[in-house]
């Protein structure tokens, strides 16, 4: 997605503040779970932490438009396509998980057998709310901020690491915690790939995938009760599906790029190389603007020179015309004076001849 860039200092500080506030609020809210009276598998109040952290960062830092660029509620064909994928991928993951249980264990353990004393609609509403609060903070806000400086793939890795640290569960030992970390990391990577190139329309896709995954776990697996085999199956199934999905996505984009002869930016507006050429583009634009200004100055200077030369030539031609007119006047006056003198001489001769003839007549 293309947005106005925030400064590097604000970028790093925003990520740091978001992480610290999220972790601190999670520790604080965890102590209030029992007092609220809602079971954790229905609604975990620690999921409010990333939502509150995002609100705090939006209020505390400038460039509000850039910070909210990842939260758009409009829907287009690409969003619908990704929502369908967000429903299909959890189904594939849990089909692999159930096949693994049937192959490597006697049967999969249902959480319903021990602790499902809440109506299904209540669980659905609770998981939708948890998904919204968590994904608003991590995907619609944090992923958008991280993508402001790095490309989508590495942004998904950074957000995935932060998300996995926030969701870490060390209650049931280190092996369980390791598989849980792998699961949450690949969970986040898949969402990052699903929301790629959606131009900020992320919340629907992330919410559907998150709610589908968490809702199915309540009924099919008992990883939340500390069952290591359940956690291992979920983690490995999610990792397998995530790797295949990312590879297929890369292959499809590469095929589209080759068959249409378009640039990667045209094929995928927010692709892996999206932010790599921004500095070069900025530099080239600045260079072009400077060249344009220089050419404008040069053209204006040339035009002024031409105008000055034209004025000078015009004045010279006018001077030449005036001088030629003066010469013509002088020649004309000279000719008139000469003509008048000749006429006077002729008149004098005629008068003399008349006088001579009159004298002869008298004699």
From Swiss-Prot:
It is found in: Cell membrane; Secreted, Cell wall; Cell septum. One of its GO terms (biological process) is CAAX-box protein maturation. GO terms for molecular function: endopeptidase activity. InterPro entries: Rce1/LyrA-like_dom. Keywords: Cell membrane, Cell wall, Membrane, Secreted, Transmembrane, Transmembrane helix. Residues 287-315, 324-363 have a biased composition (Basic and acidic residues). It is a multi-pass membrane protein. The chain crosses the membrane at residues 9-29, 41-61, 83-103, 118-138, 153-173, 175-195, 202-222, 232-252. It comes from the Bacteria. Residues 269-363 are annotated as: Disordered. One of its GO terms (cellular component) is plasma membrane. Belongs to the LyrA family. Involved in bacterial cell envelope homeostasis. Regulates peptidoglycan processing, perhaps acting as a scaffold protein. This is Lysostaphin resistance protein A. It comes from Staphylococcus haemolyticus (strain JCSC1435). The lineage of its organism: Bacteria, Bacillati, Bacillota, Bacilli, Bacillales. The gene is lyrA.
